[in-house]
Amino acid sequence: MGLLAYLKTQFVVHLLIGFVFVVSGLIINFTQLCTLALWPISKHLYRRINCRLAYSLWSQLVMLLEWWSCTECTLFTDQATVDHFGKEHVVVILNHNFEIDFLCGWTMCERFGVLGSSKVLAKRELLCVPLIGWTWYFLEIVFCKRKWEEDRDTVIEGLRRLADYPEYMWFLLYCEGTRFTETKHRISMEVAASKGLPPLKYHLLPRTKGFTTAVQCLRGTVAAIYDVTLNFRGNKNPSLLGILYGKKYEADMCVRRFPLEDIPADETSAAQWLHKLYQEKDALQEMYKQKGVFPGEQFKPARRPWTLLNFLCWATILLSPLFSFVLGVFASGSPLLILTFLGFVGAASFGVRRLIGVTEIEKGSSYGNQELKKKE
């Protein structure tokens, strides 16, 4: 094992990475709070500044994927589709099977220059997650409780606000509503059978309200739908902890572009279109399982240096005073001061672990299990 590979497995190194992410995130969030004063003066300027502030935070996670773990992402698509990347507003539909599916989406956003302006329809609980939820709030992310009767007006208003967004945005939709688990899949297929819909093997039944509403509200702004089907070579099931330990994964993404004018305008037909899309996604996953590749040309967009440079800048700014402080604590010889510092380190470690836990499937939401609970 080389020195770098050894360092990637060390808890202290992970703690330092977490320290840089958390402290820089708090600085970024405070700066975002200050930019609220710009909103009544220039909404466009507020948005452009916050896109760059968000980039400075999100790119640290992308750096872990691209430069720390050296995970490779391969696109299976065509040149005409690639030529549109980063040059239009789009809605992205991504399967929700993996703990780092969002990170693979973000690395593609970064490579095509839309990471800071990327959007998502997110569950409202994430608004309370430090750094992540707070940054999303300033980015005008649309949050929902996943109860359509309560969400309808909030979602519509949030989507319509994005109609004049000044930067090209990729708006991510997880139409399945929650991460795939065997229990959720069984319940979902019971619902599909009751509605006379074909069963899906690798996906949950898509929930159509968010999709049809997004299409209706963003029509005229969004140019296309990108359907992205993600899987990993070697039947791997990657995790954010694995990335932190430097494990390398190989992600494959099949990307199909559908011009928005090809999507039916009425809600019922659009919902039927989405169900058909998920049947096609299921067939793509079956092909991947059998052949190990998706159809289409292979593209490997080059990683850019900005994510690494951004992290190194933050690390230089934040770790130098930290090391001086730690040396001062231990040089003082005060047991109380040393114990207090160690307690802070333990609390910080716990906090970082909780942030990572947000991505873990076994600690994910119970959304999708509700019908099972009713039966019990």
Curated annotation (Swiss-Prot):
The chain crosses the membrane at residues 125-145, 317-339. One of its GO terms (biological process) is CDP-diacylglycerol biosynthetic process. Keywords: Acyltransferase, Endoplasmic reticulum, Lipid biosynthesis, Lipid metabolism, Membrane, Nucleus, Phospholipid biosynthesis, Phospholipid metabolism, Transferase, Transmembrane, Transmembrane helix. Its EC number is 2.3.1.51. Pfam families: Acyltransf_C (PF16076), Acyltransferase (PF01553). InterPro entries: Acyltransf_C, Plipid/glycerol_acylTrfase. It catalyses: a 1-acyl-sn-glycero-3-phosphate + an acyl-CoA = a 1,2-diacyl-sn-glycero-3-phosphate + CoA; pentadecanoyl-CoA + 1-(9Z-octadecenoyl)-sn-glycero-3-phosphate = 1-(9Z)-octadecenoyl-2-pentadecanoyl-sn-glycero-3-phosphate + CoA; heptadecanoyl-CoA + 1-(9Z-octadecenoyl)-sn-glycero-3-phosphate = 1-(9Z)-octadecenoyl-2-heptadecanoyl-sn-glycero-3-phosphate + CoA; 1-(9Z-octadecenoyl)-sn-glycero-3-phosphate + octadecanoyl-CoA = 1-(9Z-octadecenoyl)-2-octadecanoyl-sn-glycero-3-phosphate + CoA. Widely expressed. Mainly expressed in testis, kidney and liver (at protein level). In males, activity increases in an age-dependent fashion, maybe derived from the induction by sex-hormones. One of its GO terms (molecular function) is 1-acylglycerol-3-phosphate O-acyltransferase activity. It is an enzyme of class 2 (transferase). Residues 1-124, 340-376 are cytoplasmic. The HXXXXD motif is essential for acyltransferase activity and may constitute the binding site for the phosphate moiety of the glycerol-3-phosphate. This is 1-acyl-sn-glycerol-3-phosphate acyltransferase gamma. It comes from Mus musculus.
